[in-house]
């Protein structure tokens, strides 16, 4: 008998009511597995307990007549200029490996391939979901966790039409030296004194979506920072050896390394490091879907982009993307590993970049040229320095960093919808970046919204749209900021179902398998802190 697909938390005690907004998702899931295979099980609503009516989402219906008129005029002008953009004759399921970077996106960025544009935005929305579901409110005892139970995660964010199901939530200990990144409650009674929710792992379960994609996709989405850039000042700009390999010359930034590898034995959520959580869950899913065409895609924004690259490298370095055991009679096949990085900083040194290339980790970095985050760390020595390799090899220069992968550089000044601002947070904003992807068709080509993505999304967490469009800044929030009336008629923040940590015995079981494989393959374990 096959193992259960997802062995996460028990059923939610309190359920959240569906939003009153018009949902974008209309496709019903056609699952060929029972509900017991999914991580979060459903239970009926509890009439005795307060519930929350959520009216916020990762999508928007705030478009004003002025916005719609501007887009219509843009479309007319676009048609009059008779600009021609390449339309792919082949469906995505026939060219998905190229779209995932098998040829380093050669010929797909200029002009922008329409399949690639949609995939960049789709994975960007997976990263944005980490923000839209995160509780930033310091007045809530749930500050630092996810607002939604995994069984309802994509539904609450109006993303059920993406065809994915949450497999596992990811946590990291906040007891490291990045105080401006972690969110903590001001209350004495809190959900956890050590942990912060860091993202999730999801898998394509809708068979129609799997058919469209051409494979079973596993996505790892990391939370970063929406517009706040204070965390940059916490970086020590210190490189440390990545203990995922025997080569000490491969180095990554110390703060990123600590965030990925540190754990807190006394904490239910962080008794396993974020690294261990990711590796164990990917191992489990690959075993469950053994024999299928699979891809592993990492995505993240800002600091989350750094974690996406590190975890993708880690999976490849350990050979988890090699589908069969070493003693198997079948030949091993390599599962593609792709990273969609949004506004990410540099992660490691030139040796780290070169090793990612050797392992076949494909990274597409999407940036705004006015954003400062992609310029750090490594201001003194980086990939733009002609003699960087000599500097690292001959002098062991301790502050040398290099970006990994292919860069898609966009400019927010090319969008007619965005105002000129000196707010660095706007240039760093993920929704603004996805807006730029939607309008980009190639170098020196006019900005035209190809997917007609709602421009109101840009102002979800910032003030970047021109005021003439009538979209308020920072508009996204829960109705009444999550407050509800209890049975006594008083306004309170409702209790949420407890998010149980993933079963430790399950995580330990799959980590043991990884360790055995690493030892068998190389004669010595490569798991470092594990």
Which residue ranges define each predicted feature?
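Serine hydrolase/lipase
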Residues: 2-119, 216, 252-253, 257-259, ...
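Short secondary-structure subsegments characteristic of cysteine-rich extracellular domains
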Residues: 55, 88, 123-129, 248
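Structured beta-strand/turn binding interfaces of compact recognition modules in eukaryotic regulators
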Residues: 123-132, 146, 151, 202-206, ...
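Short, surface-exposed "cap/lid" segments of acyl-processing enzymes
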Residues: 192-248
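Catalytic nucleophile loop
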Residues: 305
């Amino acid at each position: 008998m096959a193992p259960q697909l997802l062995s996460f938390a028990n059923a939610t005690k309190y359920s959240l009511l569906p939003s009153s907004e018009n949902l974008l998702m209309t496709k019903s899931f056609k699952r060929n597995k029972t509900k017991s295979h999914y991580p979060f099980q459903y239970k009926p609503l509890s009439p005795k307990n307060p519930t929350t009516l959520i009216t916020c989402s990762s999508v928007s219906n705030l478009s004003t007549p002025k916005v719609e008129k501007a887009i219509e005029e843009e479309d007319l002008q676009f048609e009059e200029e008779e600009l021609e953009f390449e339309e792919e004759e082949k469906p995505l399921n026939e060219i998905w490996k190229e779209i995932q970077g098998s040829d380093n996106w050669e010929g797909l960025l200029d002009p922008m391939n329409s399949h690639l544009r949609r995939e960049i935005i789709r994975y960007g929305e997976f990263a944005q979901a980490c923000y839209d579901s995160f509780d930033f409110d310091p007045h809530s005892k749930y500050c630092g966790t996810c607002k939604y139970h995994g069984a309802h995660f994509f539904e609450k964010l109006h993303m059920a039409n993406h065809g994915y199901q949450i497999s596992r939530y990811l946590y990291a200990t906040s007891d490291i030296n990045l105080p401006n990144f972690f969110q903590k409650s001001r209350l004495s009674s809190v959900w956890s004194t050590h942990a912060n929710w860091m993202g999730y792992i999801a898998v394509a379960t809708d068979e129609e979506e799997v058919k469209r994609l051409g494979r079973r996709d596993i996505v790892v989405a990391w939370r970063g920072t929406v517009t706040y850039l204070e965390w940059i000042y916490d970086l020590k700009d210190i490189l440390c050896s990545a203990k995922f390999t025997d080569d000490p010359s491969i180095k990554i930034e110390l703060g990123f390394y600590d965030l990925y590898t540190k754990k807190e034995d006394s904490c239910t959520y962080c008794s396993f490091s974020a690294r261990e959580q990711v590796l164990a869950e990917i191992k489990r899913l690959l075993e469950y879907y053994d024999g299928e065409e699979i891809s592993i895609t990492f995505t993240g924004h800002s600091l989350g982009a750094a974690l996406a690259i590190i975890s993708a490298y880690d999976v490849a370095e350990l050979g988890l993307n090699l589908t069969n055991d070493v003693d198997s009679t079948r030949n091993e096949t390599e599962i593609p590993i792709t990273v969609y990085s949004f506004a990410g900083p540099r992660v490691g040194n030139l040796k780290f970049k070169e090793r990612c290339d050797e392992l076949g980790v494909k990274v597409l970095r999407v940036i705004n040229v006015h954003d400062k985050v992609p310029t750090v760390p490594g201001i003194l020595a980086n990939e733009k320095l002609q003699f960087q390799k000599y500097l690292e090899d001959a002098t062991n220069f301790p502050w040398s960093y290099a970006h990994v992968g292919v860069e898609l550089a966009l400019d927010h000044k090319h969008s007619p919808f965005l105002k000129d601002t000196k707010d660095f947070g706007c240039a760093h904003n993920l929704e603004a970046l996805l807006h730029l992807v939607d309008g980009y068709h190639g170098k020196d080509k006019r900005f035209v919204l190809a997917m007609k993505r709602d421009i109101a999304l840009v102002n979800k967490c910032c003030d970047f749209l021109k005021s003439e469009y009538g979209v308020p800044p920072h508009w996204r929030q829960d109705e009444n900021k999550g407050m509800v009336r209890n049975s006594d008629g008083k306004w309170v923040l409702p209790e949420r179902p407890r998010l149980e940590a993933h079963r430790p015995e399950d995580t330990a079981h799959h980590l043991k398998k990884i360790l055995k494989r690493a030892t068998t393959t190389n004669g010595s374990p490569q798991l470092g802190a594990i």
